[in-house]
């Protein structure tokens, strides 16, 4: 009983500290200096997939023809990317942010860089969102001009939400 009570208190304190850290991160201004912007295209789309091995996807060299759009689209596919960490949150933190001495600088991320360069930014997610800045990735998302989460609550909030529903948000 004592250990359970102690664990509850410790875990609760860790959650509170993480929420305070996320709120602090949300207020930090980016430090990007953009010297020139010469976009080749009017629209850029970045699709971030997770929890899928590239050898299971045809567009990335897999043996199955299961990615017809990605296999035929006129775009750049990073087929040799290796996750920066074993967990999604840490990997995306190291991938989407500027990293200094091995630590992600959450205020300097690819969304704030695009904003600073004058692009209009949108973030669509099929992940859950518990609070405004519940994770470091949500704090990146919230820096976009337009932000839409399909799910409210944790990532299991509505397991039946299909990625295709993200397309409805673009109409």
Model-derived features: where do they sit?
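Active-site-proximal alpha/beta segments of enzymes that process anionic O-linked groups
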Residues: 2-46, 51-171
């Amino acid at each position: 009983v004592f250990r359970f009570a102690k664990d509850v208190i410790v875990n609760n304190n860790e959650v509170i500290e993480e929420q305070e850290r996320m709120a602090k991160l949300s207020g930090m201004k980016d430090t990007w200096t953009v010297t020139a912007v010469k976009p080749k295209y009017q629209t850029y789309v970045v699709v971030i997939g997770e929890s899928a091995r590239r050898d299971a996807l045809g567009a990335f060299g897999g043996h199955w023809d299961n990615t017809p759009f990605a296999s035929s689209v006129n775009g750049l596919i990073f087929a040799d990317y290796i996750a920066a960490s074993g967990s999604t949150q840490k990997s995306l933190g190291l991938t989407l942010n500027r990293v200094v001495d091995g630590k992600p600088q959450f205020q300097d991320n690819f969304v704030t860089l695009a904003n600073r360069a004058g692009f209009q930014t949108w973030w669509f997610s099929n992940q859950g969102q518990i609070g405004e800045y519940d994770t470091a990735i949500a704090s990146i998302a919230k820096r976009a001009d337009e932000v839409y989460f399909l799910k409210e609550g944790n990532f299991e909030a509505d397991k039946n939400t299909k990625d295709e529903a993200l397309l409805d948000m673009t109409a």
